[in-house]
Amino acid sequence: MAEVPPGPSSLLPPPAPPAPAAVEPRCPFPAGAALACCSEDEEDDEEHEGGGSRSPAGGESATVAAKGHPCLRCPQPPQEQQQLNGLISPELRHLRAAASLKSKVLSVAEVAATTATPDGGPRATATKGAGVHSGERPPHSLSSNARTAVPSPVEAAAASDPAAARNGLAEGTEQEEEEEDEQVRLLSSSLTADCSLRSPSGREVEPGEDRTIRYVRYESELQMPDIMRLITKDLSEPYSIYTYRYFIHNWPQLCFLAMVGEECVGAIVCKLDMHKKMFRRGYIAMLAVDSKYRRNGIGTNLVKKAIYAMVEGDCDEVVLETEITNKSALKLYENLGFVRDKRLFRYYLNGVDALRLKLWLR
């Protein structure tokens, strides 16, 4: 078998073994010094990037000088300090590009979410690291010493608010949720007030029952029992049915009832005639409101309706008598403009004094 002649590579002398790292002195300059420590691979990359145009006169001597200088030969630093003086090693270039691309994608997503908000306000999107806990470092990430790019606004928000980064929500979403909760509470309170099962006086109300207070004029004799029931229960002295018929049959337009559903809860009975043949005087004979519906303005509204009806009848003044001890009735009439005209001693059958109140219309 013929012997293969040795190739040209076999004629070259074997490469000298590299000197042990322990013998070489460590670089005395810090990471931010003016002289940069580069590996042989980086020098080869720079030669290729420069197009191979290396000076034949000074290139080799510079390499020899660099190799022979004790401070320019430094051991390879650890992985977390690959970037020195703004230079990035080839092993970290793809990581730098990935981080830059990720920040651009997050910025575009934030702008799209803000423009998609219907009310024009800023709307937060999922922040960086939504699926990674705040204490963990995502894969292929640079250390704090090797990171030179300016963080995006979304990353800054996530870094400043760990709870937002942990939940994937920013402060804007929390504010919107609080506003929605406030609107729900206001709506529920309004619905509760409208759909309450209690009347304004505190009485239980059946579901579906109409609790609106209606004011109607006297219409027929069928309403007489309700009027008598209210007035007999509240007034200080009883009246016969003839007294009711005298007022109601002669001045039915001056008799008003307050109705809640089909129940009569208030009534007022008045008259209007000539006084001393000089002027027309109106007289409020009876006013009563069911005790369960008091303090709802029913008595005031009944008196107002009666006075308006008297004004239509060309009334000059309105008078009435009430017990001097009935503070609520005195307050009601005085709030409507009545004044105390005269005190009538032992006016009622129970011996209580009365006050005559008067309202001048002209």
From Swiss-Prot:
This is N-alpha-acetyltransferase 30. GO terms for biological process: protein stabilization. It comes from Homo sapiens (Human). Component of the N-terminal acetyltransferase C (NatC) complex, which is composed of NAA35, NAA38 and NAA30. Catalytic subunit of the N-terminal acetyltransferase C (NatC) complex. Catalyzes acetylation of the N-terminal methionine residues of peptides beginning with Met-Leu-Ala and Met-Leu-Gly. N-terminal acetylation protects proteins from ubiquitination and degradation by the N-end rule pathway. Necessary for the lysosomal localization and function of ARL8B sugeesting that ARL8B is a NatC substrate. Residues 214-362 form the N-acetyltransferase domain. Residues 1-26, 38-88, 113-182 are annotated as: Disordered. The modification Phosphothreonine is found at residue 117. Keywords: Acetylation, Acyltransferase, Cytoplasm, Nucleus, Phosphoprotein, Transferase. PROSITE patterns: GNAT (PS51186). Its EC number is 2.3.1.256. It is found in: Cytoplasm; Nucleus. Belongs to the acetyltransferase family. MAK3 subfamily. The lineage of its organism: Eukaryota, Metazoa, Chordata, Craniata, Vertebrata. Residues 149-165 have a biased composition (Low complexity).
